[in-house]
Amino acid sequence: MKHLDYIHEVPSNCDYGTEDRSIYLTFDDGPNPHCTPEILDVLAEYGVPATFFVIGTYAKSQPELIRRIVAEGHEVANHTMTHPDLSTCGPHEVEREIVEASEAIIAACPQAAVRHIRAPYGVWSEEALTRSASAGLTAIHWSADPRDWSRPGANAIVDAVLDSVRPGAIVLLHDGCPPDESGALTGLRDQTLMALSRIVPALHERGFAIRPLPPHH
C-alpha cells in the first residue's frame, strides 16, 4: 500500500523544478472581505500568483471573492468546511469537511479547479490524508511559516520569510481567520499586507521566481 504524506516543499522533479529558484505563496483562512481584496491588489501589482486555501463556509458567504481570486489567475484550494482539527474528527466528519468545502468552492465559481488541500492548523491525520487522496486532492503543508497570524510586526514577518526560503519553498501566510475567531475585523491582516508588499520584491531581488503550485499526480 502506498504511504500517504503531505508536501512541504516542491521537489525538483515537479513541473518547474528548482533550477529557476521557484517559490510558492499560499494564503490560509480566507476569503475575508476586509483582507483578501488588498492581498489580491498587491499580488496584481507585482504580477505574481498565489494559492488561497479557503474555508468552505467563507466560500459560501463570499462567492464574489472566490470568483475574483480565480479571475485574477490564482488557485483556490481546500482548507475544509469549518476549520476543525481533523485529528479529532471521525472518518465521516473528515470526509464531510473535505467534500463540502470543495463543493462550496465550485458552487461559488464553477471554473475553479480544486486540486490541493491543507489541513487546519497543519495537523494531518492518516484519515485526513486518505480522504484527501480519495477526493483527488494533493495534501500541501509549508516550509516557511512567519507566524503572521500572531501579528509579530511586518518586519518580523519579512525577516522570517527571507531567512527561511530556499528553492521549492512553500510560504504560509494568512488572509483571514478561522470561524471561531473574530475574522471580520478591519485591519486584521494589515501586517501581512505590509509584509507582502516587501516580500515579493525582495524575493525577486534574490533571484527567486514566484510561481503557482504545480499539479501533482
From Swiss-Prot:
Keywords: Cytoplasm, Hydrolase, Metal-binding, Nodulation, Plasmid. Its main location: cytoplasm. It is found in: Cytoplasm. Signal peptide: none annotated. Its EC number is 3.5.1.-. The record marks D148 as: Raises pKa of active site His. A divalent metal cation binds at H79, H83. The active site is at D28, H174. The keyword Hydrolase applies. GO terms for biological process: carbohydrate metabolic process. PANTHER family: CHITIN DEACETYLASE 1-RELATED, GLYCOSYL TRANSFERASE-RELATED. This is Chitooligosaccharide deacetylase.
